[in-house]
Curated annotation (Swiss-Prot):
Participates in both the initiation and recycling phases of transcription. In the presence of the delta subunit, RNAP displays an increased specificity of transcription, a decreased affinity for nucleic acids, and an increased efficiency of RNA synthesis because of enhanced recycling. Keywords: DNA-directed RNA polymerase, Nucleotidyltransferase, Transcription, Transferase. GO terms for biological process: DNA-templated transcription; regulation of DNA-templated transcription. Residues 14-83 form the HTH HARE-type domain. It comes from Streptococcus gordonii (strain Challis / ATCC 35105 / BCRC 15272 / CH1 / DL1 / V288). GO terms for molecular function: DNA-directed RNA polymerase activity. This is Probable DNA-directed RNA polymerase subunit delta. The gene is rpoE. Residues 119-138, 145-195 have a biased composition (Acidic residues). Belongs to the RpoE family. Residues 119-195 are annotated as: Disordered. HAMAP family: RNApol_bact_RpoE (MF_00357). RNAP is composed of a core of 2 alpha, a beta and a beta' subunits. The core is associated with a delta subunit and one of several sigma factors. PROSITE patterns: HTH_HARE.
Amino acid sequence: MELEVFAGQEKSELSMIEVARAILELRGRDHEMYFNDLVNEIQTYLEKSNSEIREALPLFYTELNVDGSFIPLGDNKWGLRSWYAIDEVDEEIIALEETDEEDNPKSRKKKRVNAFMDGDEDAIDYSDDDPEDEDSYEADPALNYDDENPDDEKNEADAYDAEINEIAPDDLDEDVDINEEDDEFSDDDAEGEEE
């Protein structure tokens, strides 16, 4: 295969990405290529060995993805972005999304009727909850606190007493003297400071 674009140029000076672009341009729009076939044709044109191609393959694949002139067409097929108008690319993406939705139909939710809305289409129906809200929250019954249950209050008091006993056990026989008079500060000093 001979590429007229590179006539007179040394093949060893050409990059794989340049050759890929030239090969795809030569083949035309209706002949997009699988990645493996594209690499094989590049290898044939540049007359490189398998080990040279294997070594350059990660960089080539990265350049192919980063270079804005190439477009992945799915199933590891590649083409040139210039072959497709922007609107056409969007249409293909939308068509793929529509087929995905057809494959996985969503279950319909029953419509609730609000008697107070009276057919006012502009009114906001606040009773129409999000699907995430439908999953009800069920608390652990052991954690449920009942105001009328005296056992809850007793358990709470016992837990409080246990915490106090951890800090100051009941068997301490020390007398703690509280000295109400403070030598450094007296009530007279406080009155003098306020004035």
